[in-house]
Amino acid sequence: MRNKAVLDLHLVSDSTCETVIAVARSAVEHFKSLEVNEFVWSLVGSKRQVDKVMLNINPERHNLIMYTVVDDDLRKYLKEKATAQSVRCIPVLAHVIREISCYLQVTKDPNAHPHKLGDEYFNRIDAINYTISHDDGQNLWDIDQADIIIVGVSRTSKSPTSIYLAYRGYRVVNIPLVCSVQLPVDPATIADKLVVGLTIDADRLIQIRRNRLISMKHQENCNYVSYEQVVEEINEMKKICAKNRWPTIDVTQKSVEEIAATIIQFFNRKNNRTGDALY
């Protein structure tokens, strides 16, 4: 069996590193034979901090730097240091910025500072805190502050989807639907909110629940993994969503990212918005 190539990937930014992380991870997904060790260097705003990055690069390994640095002098310094250590250095936005500039015959703003720590950053932190405190039907007293409400039976990816959306700036409440138990919130009070139901194939849900019980070293709960019980739960959830005209998503073959992307589309449609980020 062929060994995987190993790469130390250093992600450098003078801000939060979100852009370079997103680009880098999307890029390495195309190389399944590659094993990547990721090093994140955010808020690198001085030559001294660049020096610290370079000191942590092992010359005995394959290294690559990907970066977003706004300051021209600092960017030049980083490239010089990388060249001196024979490390390849890739600016992830330079090509795109150059193409836009050439196409529109405009120059870039020298004072631009993508993802500067400001309202956007703190709004996102607020969304994450709100979503965590409203996981699994908790603290519904201020559900009116939510942007999105997710409902579904147990083990349908409600929590990870909620957290993913929170990192995109959405305040999310997720509510478990339990068979024969009344919904813990009056649907009339959330009529103006986007409420999305997550459904799943019964056989797949049973498999997920069994794996969950095994991982927690619990004895198999007959009702929890009973086919009849699971089908009843799913059907009851679908009826609740249909009655309240809430859209549903079949998550059987979907990743968390795909589920979240669909929910964002629903949100934009409901609020006559374009784009995919709230903040």
Swiss-Prot record:
User: What family does the database annotate?
Assistant: Belongs to the pyruvate, phosphate/water dikinase regulatory protein family. PDRP subfamily.
What's this chain's function? Bifunctional serine/threonine kinase and phosphorylase involved in the regulation of the pyruvate, phosphate dikinase (PPDK) by catalyzing its phosphorylation/dephosphorylation.
Coiled coil ranges: none
Enzyme Commission numbers on file: 2.7.11.32, 2.7.4.27
Q: Where does ADP bind?
A: 152-159
UniProt GO molecular function: ADP binding; ATP binding; phosphotransferase activity, phosphate group as acceptor; protein serine/threonine kinase activity
Q: Which reaction does it catalyse?
A: N(tele)-phospho-L-histidyl/L-threonyl-[pyruvate, phosphate dikinase] + ADP = N(tele)-phospho-L-histidyl/O-phospho-L-threonyl-[pyruvate, phosphate dikinase] + AMP + H(+); N(tele)-phospho-L-histidyl/O-phospho-L-threonyl-[pyruvate, phosphate dikinase] + phosphate + H(+) = N(tele)-phospho-L-histidyl/L-threonyl-[pyruvate, phosphate dikinase] + diphosphate
Q: What keywords are assigned to this protein?
A: Kinase, Nucleotide-binding, Serine/threonine-protein kinase, Transferase
In the record, what lineage is assigned to the organism producing the protein?
Bacteria, Pseudomonadati, Pseudomonadota, Alphaproteobacteria, Rickettsiales
Q: Which InterPro entries match?
A: Kinase-pyrophosphorylase, PPDK_reg
**Does the keyword field hold Nucleotide-binding?**
yes
What is the name attached to this protein's record? Answer: Putative pyruvate, phosphate dikinase regulatory protein
Q: Does the keyword Kinase apply?
A: yes
Q: Which Pfam families is this protein grouped with?
A: Kinase-PPPase
Q: Domain of life of the organism in this record? A: Bacteria
